[in-house]
Amino acid sequence: MQTVIKNGTVYQNGRLIHADVLIEDQKIKAIGTDLTGDKVIDATGKLVSPGLVDVHVHYRDPGQTYKEDIETGSKAAAHGGFTTVGAMPNVTPVPDTPDLMKKMVQENKQKGIVHIFQYGPITKNETTDELPDYAALKKAGAFALSNDGHGVQTAQTMYLAMQEAKKNDLIVAAHAQDDSLFNHGIVNEGEKAKELNLPPVTELAETTQIARDLLLAEKTGVHYHICHVSTKTSVELVRMAKACGINVTCEAAPHHLLLTEDDIPKDNGYYKMNPPLRSKEDQAALLVGLLDGTIDLIATDHAPHAKQEKQGGMQNAAFGITGSETAFSTLYTKFVKEDKVFTLEQLLSWLSDQPAKVFGLKKAGVLEPGCPADVAIFDLEHETELKEKDYQSKGINTPFTGQKIYGATVMTMVDGEVVYQRGEK
């Protein structure tokens, strides 16, 4: 059967064109005008995009499925227009052996409704200085390496890890955090920490480890990717490293682009995340970094928690914010429609073809004949409200609930099959 998406504004190769999209046998067959098919999806007045790509999600499965599981996490991704995600390995048990990795990859495929690529850990159990067998993990299905949630504390361990990752052509995606400098902090070091009387987090906890790792990456030649950069100095370090030819890429998270420490209204656990919300100066540097290419992509760091884990104030709340279901609409509303900081084409690139390109996910994040029919359709014209009852994730820990947005997802397709449709649970 052939399905045609008619009369949409299609994002293709960095451009927006008025076109139809023809789907057959789970793939894009053609993009053009006056196309016909057995089934017609009317996209008049809608944006037709490649399925978005999020290289940074936490699905808590196995080990903490009361927070999220593969099924609900992938449903949340589809609700946000994402059809390809990278799942972090900070689950229980950590997939640090070939058998555990194979099981994770199999579970992702069986339970997920989107394409889920699985990270392996940089170190065994994410908390030791012992390296797993990277070659075996890659053979079992690991697409990259990360200890996200933990910084690699020992320089020698990271140096050895980068050498082995380079040998096995694996990306090292780092959560840059020096625990001795983080020092159990909660809020960015500044006036807000003083106002709330909460332990501060110095930006040095992030920047010193980035500086260290950039030197190690230069020495080893590994592809070093930095997760959720959040400070002006981090951006400056990456900019200098790229100018020196170091093989480094990095991502920014939607919440660090949209919010600052000044937006924390009170001691509210929904605003507790790691890295913390930073200053307006840091936020401005992130936006400049995206626009000048220093920051390569946007990734959500979708980190769901049970409701009770985010209550009782920031001191006791868990770190983390959800993002899969709110990323595109909140970023589009703020930076494209209202403030006109980005173009729609730029935003779509940072959320689709760029993350796919950085991580070597061939045929993801693009609409081209022969590619999988992974498609997202968005409504840019009508205002809606973000409501808890509409979330597909088990986690509702986002401060964006109640916000009026444009860019709600109308439909998401994976391999030509509808996996999300607005109005249907």
Swiss-Prot record:
Zn(2+) 1 binds at H56, H58, D148, D301. This is Dihydroorotase. It comes from the Bacteria. Its EC number is 3.5.2.3. The gene is pyrC. It comes from Lactobacillus helveticus (strain DPC 4571). Zn(2+) 2 binds at D148, H175, H228. HAMAP family: PyrC_classI_B. GO terms for cellular component: cytoplasm. The active site is at D301. InterPro entries: Amidohydro-rel, DHOase, DHOase/Allantoinase_Hydrolase, Dihydroorotase_CS, Metal-dep_hydrolase_composite, Metal_Hydrolase. Binds 2 Zn(2+) ions per subunit.
